[in-house]
């Protein structure tokens, strides 16, 4: 009898991707975050679909429809908070996934890495548009401030902003189009994830040592499916704890006030996962310079393969590079803290120093350090 798993055209693809996939035998828990992101995407699409059934993208009724979901729809409150806090889980896993990629030198798989960066940009765009939909104060003013940044682009900036708004300010047209894009983008992200995996399976997974492990591979199932299942359990436990005990912990109280174009909140700030980029944006007094720094803070990841000067792929056996990596992590945490603070002394100078250090570490210190470590290998 023929084995359907190995011979059926569709099952064969699943088999080669999830069951008989040759996987390095020494990959650690850091390799769990890819599958956790897949779980998060699934949760977000399902909860988002149910929310979209009850949400109305009209400036007059958007806020009320979200209230209606929480009060009147069966289990609407849990669906809404799973979706809102699910976004925080997505970014927690994303940052850890990227951090591990940098630490273990996975960016040398340039196709997989570049599609990952494209995915990051798309996830950030989707999340930003989703934050606008409840039409609270922070939704409205966040949309106004962030879209207004495009006006810094010379010559076409003002026209571009009005084109995105669909008028002369953030209004009904803006909300409707943001809802449309917020709905469609996760499906495009899901398709890109498939391409991300396609390129990954062309080369095979990296491992903590950074050394080619073709001589020592084990099947993905059952060894890593069980490991992923444990990760799923921990992630769902963490998400449900957050949703059931303190669902508004990561939100902004201002978003429980309906949007009012005549009343500006005292501190306009995005969700916690954008604060590091927001701090970099604010640290440069010039508007265009700030926007460029904001884009480059993410786009800089694309040149990481070209900045890799070490003879070793992973940082596992490179203590000086490890130190710089953890300084970079501390710097990003500092930027996240600064992004949530008001624009006043001493936060301005701390933000500027942290922003400078971020670029200096990635562009100068880490490549230089790798060259020094290469010299030390000969001693």
Swiss-Prot record:
Q: Name one GO cellular component term.
A: mitochondrial inner membrane
Task: Write down the Pfam families for this protein, in alphabetical order.
Answer: Cytochrom_B_C (PF00032), Cytochrome_B (PF00033)
Note accompanying the cofactor annotation: Binds 2 heme b groups non-covalently.
- Has keyword Lyase? no
Q: Which GO terms describe its molecular function?
A: metal ion binding; ubiquinol-cytochrome-c reductase activity
Q: Which family does it belong to?
A: Belongs to the cytochrome b family.
Role according to the record: Component of the ubiquinol-cytochrome c reductase complex (complex III or cytochrome b-c1 complex) that is part of the mitochondrial respiratory chain. The b-c1 complex mediates electron transfer from ubiquinol to cytochrome c. Contributes to the generation of a proton gradient across the mitochondrial membrane that is then used for ATP synthesis.
- The protein's name in its UniProt record: Cytochrome b
What is the organism field in this record?
A: Ochotona alpina
Corresponding gene?
MT-CYB
């Amino acid at each position: 009898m023929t084995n359907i798993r190995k011979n059926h055209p569709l099952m064969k693809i699943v088999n080669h991707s999830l069951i008989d996939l040759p996987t390095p035998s020494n990959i650690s828990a850091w390799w769990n975050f890819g599958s956790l992101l897949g779980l998060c995407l699934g949760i977000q699409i399902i909860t988002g679909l149910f929310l979209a059934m009850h949400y109305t993208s009209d400036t007059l009724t958007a806020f009320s429809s979200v209230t209606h979901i929480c009060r009147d729809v069966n289990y609407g409150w849990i669906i809404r908070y799973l979706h809102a806090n699910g976004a925080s889980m997505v970014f927690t896993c994303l940052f850890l996934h990227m951090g591990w990629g940098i630490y273990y030198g996975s960016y040398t798989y340039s196709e997989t890495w570049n599609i990952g960066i494209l995915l990051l940009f798309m996830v950030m765009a989707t999340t930003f548009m989703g934050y606008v939909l409840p039409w609270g104060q922070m939704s409205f003013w966040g949309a106004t401030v962030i879209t207004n940044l495009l006006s810094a682009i010379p010559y076409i900036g003002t026209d571009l902003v009005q084109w995105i708004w669909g008028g002369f300010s953030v209004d009904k047209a803006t909300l409707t189009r943001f809802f449309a894009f917020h709905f469609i983008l996760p499906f495009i992200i899901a398709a890109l994830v498939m391409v991300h995996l396609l390129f990954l399976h062309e080369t095979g997974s990296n491992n903590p040592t950074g050394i080619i492990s073709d001589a020592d591979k084990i099947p993905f199932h059952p060894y890593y499916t069980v490991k992923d299942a444990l990760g799923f359990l921990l992630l769902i436990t963490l998400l449900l704890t957050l949703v059931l005990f303190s669902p508004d912990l990561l939100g902004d109280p201002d978003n429980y006030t309906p949007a009012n174009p005549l009343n500006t909140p005292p501190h306009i700030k995005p969700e916690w996962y954008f604060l590091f980029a927001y701090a970099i944006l604010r640290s440069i007094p010039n508007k265009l310079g700030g926007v460029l720094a904001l884009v480059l803070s993410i786009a800089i990841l694309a040149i990481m393969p070209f900045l890799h000067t070490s003879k070793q792929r992973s940082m596992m056996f490179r203590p000086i590079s490890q130190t710089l990596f953890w300084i970079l992590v501390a710097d990003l945490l500092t930027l996240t803290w600064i992004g949530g603070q008001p624009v006043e002394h001493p936060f301005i100078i701390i933000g500027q120093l942290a922003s400078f250090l971020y670029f200096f570490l990635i562009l100068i210190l880490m490549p230089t350090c790798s060259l020094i470590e290469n010299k030390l290998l000969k001693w």
